[in-house]
Regions:
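Acidic/histidine-rich catalytic cores of soluble enzymes
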Residues: 4-7, 22, 38, 78, ...
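A short, Lys/Arg-enriched amphipathic alpha-helix followed by its capping loop at the start of a domain
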Residues: 7, 29-36
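Active-site beta-loop-alpha junctions enriched in small/polar residues
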Residues: 10-16, 42-44, 80-83, 140-142, ...
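The substrate-binding groove and active-site-proximal loops of carbohydrate-active enzymes
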Residues: 15, 49-55, 104-114, 159, ...
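Active-site acidic/histidine proton-transfer and metal-coordination neighborhood
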Residues: 21, 25, 30, 66-74, ...
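A structural motif
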Residues: 36, 41, 73, 127, ...
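Glycine-rich, proline-tolerant flexible connector loops at the mouths of alpha/beta enzymes
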Residues: 41-64, 84, 139-146
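C-terminal helical cap(s) of enzyme catalytic domains, especially alpha/beta-barrels
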Residues: 308-331, 335
Length: 350
């Protein structure tokens, strides 16, 4: 067993145009002051990272990581959640997702997809330059508008969607393998990879690619009533990344899983700051330790109620309190009689 690293913080919800969130130097200092030891970097945030430079220049990456270390944090992983989303977009979502892309490819789905693929590949190369072994992203979605089986889905519709999704991602996964980096898909509603079954459907089509892995986030499982602890045991060999995020699901006689088109504040299922939701993180961290997860515990702060800076501060302490420093010996070693093969055979009557 290995002790999980952390706490880390995903900067996606914090990067902005106001200090200290508007530069790499200042945001890493801020994260360290909040108690974090690592940061996960949203590569679409140009005020923090020049992704192309990071992919093309080892010197740039050395300086980038050096600034973080000098300020007290490590770079845990890079993220292309927004770009990965654009690898596969159903036409119904074209306009909604267009803002994720560079201005020059908006309104052109084919060019936008090509741009997205290039972005993910740049991030994979940048990860290699930074010495990082795992990368966070979304799968995108072609079948999501048909998630509920009404009207009746035509035979082969979902299979065709997943065949195409695998076709788009396989060259990226091959490139990831060349860079020595795992692609960790955040299993998330709105993506075709939104639970274990859909991950397996994808995995089958990419021929169990060794670089196709999972970003585990229990909050997304709480909101769809999935057993988030059993999930860790089932996919322990594929879980290469961990978002620590809380959630609560409080159905009423008026709404349930679908949320009734309500705001996040008024939904039956909603994300919460760590400790304010229903996730049993004691059990989650125990499972992670028992299953030998050796990555980072990265706080992803999302809450419709609490101020983000309060959530960040509390999140660091929460993770510190839950990380299990794994034991190096059995608790009952004091009662050991030693190892003696002859004695073992006598005890067995052999």
């Amino acid at each position: 067993m290995r002790t999980i690293k952390g706490p880390g913080l995903f900067l996606g919800q914090f990067a902005g145009d106001v200090a200290p969130f508007d530069s790499w130097d200042s945001i890493t200092k801020w994260a360290a002051e909040k108690g974090y030891l690592g940061v996960q970097v949203p590569t679409w945030a140009g005020q923090l990272i020049d992704l192309r430079k990071a992919a093309e220049s080892k010197d740039y990456c050395d300086e980038f990581a050096g600034i973080a270390r000098q300020n007290g944090v490590e770079v845990t992983e890079l993220s292309t959640h927004l770009q990965g989303q654009l690898v596969a977009v159903h036409p119904a979502y074209d306009e909604a997702f267009d803002g994720f892309a560079a201005p020059e490819v908006r309104g052109n789905p084919k060019a936008r997809q090509q741009w997205a693929v290039e972005q993910v590949k740049l991030a994979l190369k940048a990860s290699k330059n930074l010495g990082i072994k795992a990368h966070a992203t979304f799968s995108g979605a072609l079948a999501w508008p048909f998630a509920y089986p009404w009207p009746q889905r035509p035979a082969g519709l979902v299979e065709t969607a997943f065949d195409e999704l695998a076709k788009r991602w396989t060259p990226i996964l091959d490139y990831a393998d060349e860079q020595g980096v795992d692609v960790c898909y955040e299993i998330h509603p709105g993506e075709d990879l939104h639970d274990g079954v859909t991950f397996e459907m994808f995995l089958e089509r990419v021929k169990n690619h060794s670089r196709a892995n999972m970003l585990y986030d229990p909050s997304h499982y709480v909101l769809q009533c999935l057993d988030y602890l059993d999930n860790i045991d089932i996919y322990k060999d594929r879980i290469k990344m961990f978002h620590v995020k809380d959630a609560e699901f409080n159905p009423t006689g008026r709404q349930g899983v679908y949320g009734g088109y309500q705001s996040w504040v008024n939904r039956a299922g909603r994300f919460r700051s760590l400790g304010d939701g229903q996730v049993d993180f004691g059990a989650v961290f125990s499972k992670m330790a028992a299953n030998d997860f050796d990555g980072w515990a990265v706080v992803e702060w999302e809450c419709a109620l609490k101020h983000p800076e309060d959530g960040a501060l509390e999140g660091a302490e929460f993770v510190k309190a839950h990380i299990i420093r794994v034991t190096e010996k059995a608790f009952d070693d004091f009662a050991s009689g030693g190892t003696d093969d002859a004695a073992n055979r006598r005890m067995l009557g052999l």
